[in-house]
Amino acid sequence: MDSRRSKVCGETACGFSTSSSDAKKRAASMRKLCFVVVLCLLFMSIEVVCGIKANSLAILADAAHLLTDVGAFAISMLSLWASSWEANPRQSYGFFRIEILGTLVSIQLIWLLTGILVYEAVTRLVQETNDDVDGFFMVLVAAFGLVVNIIMIVVLGHDHGHGHDHGHSHDHGHSYGERAEQLLEKSKEIRNINVQGAYLHVLGDLIQSIGVMIGGGMIWYNPKWKVIDLICTLFFSVIVLGTTIKMLRSILEVLMESTPREIDARQLEKGLMEIEEVVDVHELHIWAITVGKALFSCHVKVRPEAGDEMVLNKVIDYIWREYRISHVTIQIER
């Protein structure tokens, strides 16, 4: 009969409590989102007025896109706030996946609005309206929008790659303090998914502003080329949709509990098999509760003479050192 023992992280929430470092990162993300919301509202008001005056669908499309951005940022802030709630017996993993759901809603808003704009542009192309489009106004507004979007991109993206996950104070049967510095240097660089979603929104606006500015310049040069306004709307709507694909893929991978892309499951299993006392590894599972928070579990068959505690420590040490996974559940089998 096999002798079996399990070992999980020593603290109650085990990687899902609201640590002080997580709270600081959430607060920083909230400040960034609040700032871009204010900028979006101000610039959106300007675009609505100027878009009507210039009779430019492209400008109005950008204004509508900004309105969606404001709603998306609000959802992101709500998600950040909710993710700070502590785990409880019913929600044992906490509320981190609210971030995933919030970002998913944000992406759906982009798709909905883009579909409406494409429909309006196609309608104008088919009907061949004779309304004039003010190219100068298009260039002026788009240039201002370009500056605003660059500011927002700098605010949202200046800390790209510095969102390390430092909240690891779990008792795994031995101390990691001696090499904490080296481990932190090797940590995966992951941004808050809500800030990343906002970043994609603003990037889409930036691309659209460039397109409107180029199209406006051509219409300003020759007013008969007003069809460019509609072509710009269609072309850049496709680009905006394209910016959401990568984020949507990450969301679906989390919801499907796929192995995170940054972790090679075969290589991890190979590393475990290289531990001297390990005979076999099976029932290996790696998934993420949200982007950047991975979980791991497996069954490890060991040699009869091997000590359970020693093997557990070696396995957990390897997973932590090489993959920075703090939430680990191991079952020892003989």
Swiss-Prot record:
Where is region (Required for zinc-binding) located? 158-174
For this chain, one GO molecular function annotation is: monoatomic cation transmembrane transporter activity
- Give the location in the cell: Vacuole membrane
A Gene Ontology cellular-component term: vacuolar membrane
Write down the NCBIfam families for this protein, in alphabetical order: CDF
Instruction: Name the family.
Output: Belongs to the cation diffusion facilitator (CDF) transporter (TC 2.A.4) family. SLC30A subfamily.
Annotated protein name in UniProt: Metal tolerance protein A1
Q: Which organism is it from?
A: Arabidopsis thaliana (Mouse-ear cress)
Its ancestry begins with: Eukaryota, Viridiplantae, Streptophyta, Embryophyta, Tracheophyta
